[in-house]
Amino acid sequence: MAGPAPGTIMGEDYFGNASEWGEEADGGQHQEDDSGEGEDDAEVQQECLHKFSTRDYIMEPSIFNTLKRYFQAGGSPENVIQLLSENYTAVAQTVNLLAEWLIQTGVEPVQVQETVENHLKSLLIKHFDPRKADSIFTEEGETPAWLEQMIAHTTWRDLFYKLAEAHPDCLMLNFTVKLISDAGYQGEITSVSTACQQLEVFSRVLRTSLATILDGGEENLEKNLPEFAKMVCHGEHTYLFAQAMMSVLAQEEQGGSAVRRVAQEVQRFAQEKGHDASQITLALGTAASYPRACQALGAMLSRGALNPADITVLFKMFTSMDPPPVELIRVPAFLDLFMQSLFKPGAKINQDHKHKYIHILAYAASVVETWKKNKRVSIGKDELKSTSKAIETVHNLCCNENKGASELVAELSTLYQCIRFPVVAMGVLKWVDWTVSEPRYFQLQTDHTPVHLALLDEISTCHQLLHPQVLQLLVKLFETEHSQLDVMEQLELKKTLLDRMVHLLSRGYVLPVVSYIRKCLEKLDTDISLIRYFVTEVLDVIAPPYTSDFVQLFLPILENDSIAGTIKAEGEHDPVTEFIAHCKSNFIVVN
């Protein structure tokens, strides 16, 4: 029979050699001997013979232990030889032989190894018994050598992560995960239940994951945040621990604001999953020093709605001579409630209390406090009055159901002035989203560019931080099926939305916009004429020098067979050819 194939999983590197198993078997003998005192020799022989008759028992680690018991009970060697040889099917050796054959037929050794390992992994996952694993682990009394060897290999670490996810109460697996973490592989432990079983492991994974998010920056936040938030929101204990740690880090001058942003995104994730974490949020902030304000805030956050009674409590506190810290009301979930109350079409708000709502939102958005040694030394309210007026003006325009599109056009200059305030821009963006998402909105429009979409251009121009939300809304509208419109009307609408994306690109939000159009081209679910339209519009507004990232994204769109050669040149001016030539001569293009 062929020996082990190079690189296959059956070698001694994974499971040790026979002498090691023998020593372990001898070491475990005393326990069995003690428990087996007085056993009838015939019973022992019968038990051992039953084991010898099972398939491939000669390959089992306990073979030496069983042989010793059998011979001590007076067993016959002939029976052993006959049973072991008759039941030897050589599964492991056959795998190695097949692996050798595959390699000899030209298959890469690495590919053969992956095939064997993946099949073995699937079998282990299917047949794993946590009780047996725990019993074997308990009998060992120390960390088995084979386990330490296994965790040195990526394949088997991945197996342990999957098993730990499926069997969170298995002691052997939890211990193994800690071993993996101790060995410095905590960056791999992204599985929720695996990371959350032990505080020491969770702390390491939390630290590594948070560092990855902070180092990745805004552009990688969408990719890195969901797994992190899912892990933190695994349970109340993990949420409290993580938020408490981030609350402390958020106080640091360097990088503190970025950590606070991550903490707020996790709060939003918890809220979207239906968890009420408002009390933890308030307890970790400054609210604990203001129990009445804390009670009012907590009540509104828990209900997910503002109410006049609690708003009045906060209004009195924030119009007093010594108001609470503005940080108290700068809770994203709380500010979102103001968006719904003040900017959602058709929202009803008690007119007697409206000024209180507006004042608190304006206060949260505009007041600047100066602190030294944990003492507030000044409160800057220079922009409070103008912010309040802008919010009130736009609220009256947005929530007035009697104002149609034509009336809004007459108020555009006023809206543009008010949009310069960031909080108003956010409110207008929400209002536009709610309005244009109405099924019949575009059916009733006669203008080429509806006024609501024109407002998005102004928001893009004034507020760089709102670019992601603007693109998100445009993408949602672009991908929506407007079945109430005919085919030509749908194409015209999508061209209008592409115009907004091109404007967004011209305001500096380049890579996300081009990346989205590139995905549309690759998915083959967008009319190719729309891609050509986008390319033409972009070529009209760009000029060298270009960044390498932009070229790597945009050039493949132009070189696509459906695009190249289909965009008409204007006289002698051929922007597509000129752009491609410029890129070829100035960049090394990676396919």
From Swiss-Prot:
Main location class: nucleus
MF term (GO), any: RNA binding
Pfam families listed in its UniProt record: TH1 (PF04858)
Coiled coil: none
GO biological process, one term: negative regulation of transcription elongation by RNA polymerase II
Bias kind Acidic residues: ranges: 34-44
Keywords linked to the UniProt accession: Nucleus, Repressor, RNA-binding, Transcription, Transcription regulation
Transcription in keyword set: yes
Highest taxon in the source lineage: Eukaryota
Disordered, as annotated region: 1-44
The keyword Nucleus appears for this protein: yes
InterPro entries in the cross-refs: TH1 (IPR006942)
Subunit and interaction comment: The NELF complex is composed of NELFA, NELFB, NELFCD and NELFE; NELFA and NELFCD form a stable subcomplex that binds primarily through NELFCD to the N-terminus of NELFB. Binds RNA which may help to stabilize the NELF complex on nucleic acid. In vitro, the NELFA:NELFCD subcomplex binds to ssDNA and ssRNA in a sequence- and structure-dependent manner. Interacts with ARAF1. Interacts with PCF11. Interacts with NELFB. Interacts with KAT8.
Protein name per its UniProtKB record: Negative elongation factor D
Gene: Nelfcd
